[in-house]
UniProtKB/Swiss-Prot annotation:
Family named by the database record: Belongs to the Casparian strip membrane proteins (CASP) family.
Extracellular side: 63-73, 130-159
A GO cellular component annotation in the UniProt record: plasma membrane
Protein name as catalogued: CASP-like protein 5B1
Length: 182
């Protein structure tokens, strides 16, 4: 009877009515503002810091080579990674500010700027990393120039650029998802 109902099912209703309760609650939705890596969060700051650290490493490794200035792809990588460094550093600074004032970055105009800037720098970074990697493979495998050149240094610089690109691609995707969810 009624007394056994409370003992048999102390937490919820009767099992045959549980389906009705689930329909009323609706689907579980993960709020996009809580997505790890969103701008203005510790995760977002970590992504930006990784971007500018790898970009800076790529530039430093490339420009410490004597011959890099003689090859367009290598100069392009240095320029693209310098731009990536500046962009990511500015956005990391904005993330630090948002964390200090304990507010997110909900402004859709600002998020739109982040997405477009991320896409531009990501495209430039990927193109630069690919061209540098391609030229380095050409020098190493086809022309056998690596005996006289710093091919390992060029490969390492391209690798750092790829790492930076992966992080900017993640940031841009997260920011885009946040933007379209508003």
């Amino acid at each position: 009877g009624d007394a056994s109902h409370a003992v048999d099912h102390p937490i919820g209703g009767h099992p045959e009515h549980e389906h009705d309760l689930r329909e009323e609650e609706g689907p579980l939705i993960f709020p996009m503002k809580d997505l790890p890596g969103t701008p203005g969060t510790v995760g977002g700051l970590a992504l930006r810091m990784g971007q500018f650290i790898f970009a800076a490493a790529s530039v430093v490794i490339m420009v410490t080579s004597d011959e890099f200035i003689n090859f367009t792809a290598f100069c392009y990588l240095a320029a693209a990674m310098a731009l990536q460094f500046l962009w990511s550093f500015v956005l990391a600074t904005i993330d630090v500010y948002a964390l200090l004032i304990k507010r997110g970055l909900p402004n859709s105009i600002l998020l739109s700027l982040f997405v477009v800037g991320d896409w531009v720098t990501a495209t430039l970074s990927l193109a630069a990393a690919c061209s540098t990697a391609g030229i380095t493979v050409l020098f190493d495998k086809d022309l056998n120039y690596c005996d006289q050149m710093h091919c390992r240094r060029y490969q390492l610089s391209a690798t750092m650029a790829f790492f930076s690109w992966v992080l900017i691609a993640i940031s841009s995707l997260i920011t885009l998802l946040l933007l379209v969810s508003e």
